[in-house]
Amino acid sequence: NTYVATVNSDGKIYAKSLGSTTISYRTYNNKTASFKLTVSGSAVKCLDISTWQGYVDFNKVKSAGYNYVILRAGFGREYSQKDNTFERNYANAKAAGIKVGVYWFSYSTSPSDAYREANACLYCLNGKRLDMPVYYDLEYQPAMSMSNSNYTQMALNFCSTIKKAGYK
């Protein structure tokens, strides 16, 4: 339903009005998948920030109308794989009055690895207070060839571990 949302050629989704729609897409290995998108409120401006953006002036980000950021806490299953700008970005975003969530980039290829990734994420968070959820970024190409049930179990394992630690 293009009245609710549209998808551009890069795969970015743009909410247009309140309502629900189903978005279908083809995965890298030519499988078809879909999800239901519900637009239930006004849109907010939010940035995804990691080491790839270099130094970020969060006061300028705030002045540009962004009230939310999702910071990459890290990637993979080792405690040493914390994003090297995470601590600075977290402190500077909070100091600028920007609400913070985090994501963990997954390199997992099995449901059991997802537990290790969640624990590495929790280690990097070290009890930090978040304003938004912890997101599990599942776009690692080798994992996408897993069965749907294993892929789903991987997400459930990560999310349940994060939730048990008190995060959303």
Language-model segment annotations:
Residues 1-41:
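Extracytoplasmic soluble-region selector
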Residues 44-159, 163-165:
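Substrate-binding cleft of extracellular glycoside hydrolase catalytic domains
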